[in-house]
């Protein structure tokens, strides 16, 4: 099987696990949360059943490309940590590096992604080379591979032949696609603005960016951050304002790698508008080699 298909299958785990009665899954990559209800546990549900569901679902849906499948579930915390750092994260980094030479201008099409509509029926991600899905797990190349595997699936081609405002990232083609895939709930979406018709969010975002009115800047909180933000809200409280497939000007969900993109909040001035991030997130962003930070921004400590 081609390695390009691995993230496609991996992201489908979200749907497969949520099809189990009494089991809830959210998140992606190495930031996932699975909840098992008391009723499911009392009915005899075991961890091994997750593996059985994944095995059967992968073999059923991807039989054209998957010849053999094996599911190994780790429950020992130390072993989970080892596998995460020695196996998973290096693989994720390699996937992200594939996009280093691609820009939004260098491709002819973008892709929609509606994998999360089970939670947010009106949410539609528009995936471009420089703006990955807000979950952080679906890049432009992943969406392309998903479309090749299943032309009628969750990732559909969006042309970009009729620009309205390229600074905002506004296209007639994108608006038409969003209207179609949101069943008419959305009419306009911009790709590079947090204030004017921002992209909607479901609940799987890696980060949330929100306007901080006193500084006229923005703060960004990542999912792992459990503290209070300068907005007086925690990440879950910000999520309640941002998710659900509703456009909320001034707030947007996004992947961590989008922060390093030149298209991040391009319409509002980009990363120089960031006034606060948790230390952990700042260190992660600093490791992204593509990020360009101007000298005035460096002096402010961003």
Show which residues each predicted segment covers.
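Long, charged N-terminal interaction/targeting segments
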Residues: 1-73
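Short recognition patches in nucleic-acid-associated and regulatory proteins
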Residues: 123-126, 213-237
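Secreted, propeptide-processed cysteine-rich mini-domains
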Residues: 71-112
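Single conserved hydrophobic/aromatic residue that forms the stacking wall/gate
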Residues: 291-302
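Long, charge-rich boundary regions
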Residues: 146-198
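Cysteine-rich micro-motifs
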Residues: 129-139
